[in-house]
Amino acid sequence: MKIHEYQGKAILRKYGVAVPRGEMVTTREEAERVANDLMHDGAKGVVVKAQIHAGGRGKGGGVKIAKSVDEAGQLAGKILGMTLITHQTGPEGKKVQRLLIEETLPIERELYLSIVLDRSNGKPVFMASAAGGMEIEEVAAKDPNAIIKEWIEPGYGLGAFQARKIAFKLGLKPELIGQAVKFMQALYKTYDETDASLVEINPFITTSDNRLFALDAKFNFDDNGLFRHPDLKDLRDVTEEDPLEVEASKYGLNYIKLDGTVGCMVNGAGLAMATMDIIQYAGGMPANFLDVGGGANAEQVTHAFEILLSDKNVKAVLINIFGGILRVDTLATGVVQAATQTKIQLPIVLRLEGTNVEQGREILQKSGLNFIVAETMKDAAEKVVAAAKGVK
């Protein structure tokens, strides 16, 4: 689960991580009020920041600096309601419905900090770079040595000696080292206690008056840990998520929308990824990742089918099932129900193996629906790609 920057900063503030003063607003009038309050309280200006679940907002025109209350209001009026397009939103962009109005700060240096789970090592890794304010992937590609890494023992946490090592490698002033150690340890405590899978501060800044701040905040949370954090679960903004993905989550389905034309329904994440690979190998592009899971029932399969077909880009469907816990006859019943209810006109290719496969094939045959049967994954991929391209 992702959250907005203003929500992330509220969490950081709770854990003692310094963030600029600011407030989320949804109207021009609110923006002017917050800007007025901040400037009366010593701010030299304010930053008007679009709040969407995507990076690259500055380049897309979603982050602007205002030197006066009137200018803050004008900028808020322009940004609110705009469709912001960045390298992470896709060409369709995202509509801006809220803003963060924040004080400007006397920035001296922009750096980068993040904590993410390193699955290969089975522990969190604290990453830092002197190249802040940039896409960290670009920095790593140009110079891998520019990324400082410290692996953290979960049972111990981020040691002060590790934080000091990072601070020295970043070239921080001696008078900032102690402050930086506290900042980094508070950041790790935030990551650990919220069950986050990613906390990213880009940029992490030093100011001309020797203070440290998180100028931006990005959080990803492990969905499997949200039951322990009802307060975090309430921060979810479904308007920022794909409607089909939101609908799928209601039925316990793992669905991710992609840009292709071949709809996929598979049981098991590994088989689903292999199916997507073989579709591309056959010259097609998958329209989605859809894992119905091992314990799906006929009703869930029906919902999965309806969600898959709701994507207008889908030109053909591949159902690739290896029956284990999810029996093939259960899958077949759900597919027939969904195909009958939706009066589907698209080609459907099925590759079925495993538990109760003969019963499943019998259900499909008796349905009277026109399915294309494939014996192997290669055969299935070739048939569905041809069908998506209109080749008979």
Swiss-Prot record:
Annotated residues for binding of Mg(2+): N202, D216
EC number in record: 6.2.1.5
Catalytic activity of the protein: succinate + ATP + CoA = succinyl-CoA + ADP + phosphate; GTP + succinate + CoA = succinyl-CoA + GDP + phosphate
Assigned GO CC terms: cytosol; succinate-CoA ligase complex
Domain ATP-grasp: 9-247
Cofactor mode of binding and number, as noted: Binds 1 Mg(2+) ion per subunit.
Function (record text): Succinyl-CoA synthetase functions in the citric acid cycle (TCA), coupling the hydrolysis of succinyl-CoA to the synthesis of either ATP or GTP and thus represents the only step of substrate-level phosphorylation in the TCA. The beta subunit provides nucleotide specificity of the enzyme and binds the substrate succinate, while the binding sites for coenzyme A and phosphate are found in the alpha subunit.
Family: Belongs to the succinate/malate CoA ligase beta subunit family.
Name by which UniProt lists this protein: Succinate--CoA ligase [ADP-forming] subunit beta
UniProt source species: Koribacter versatilis (strain Ellin345)
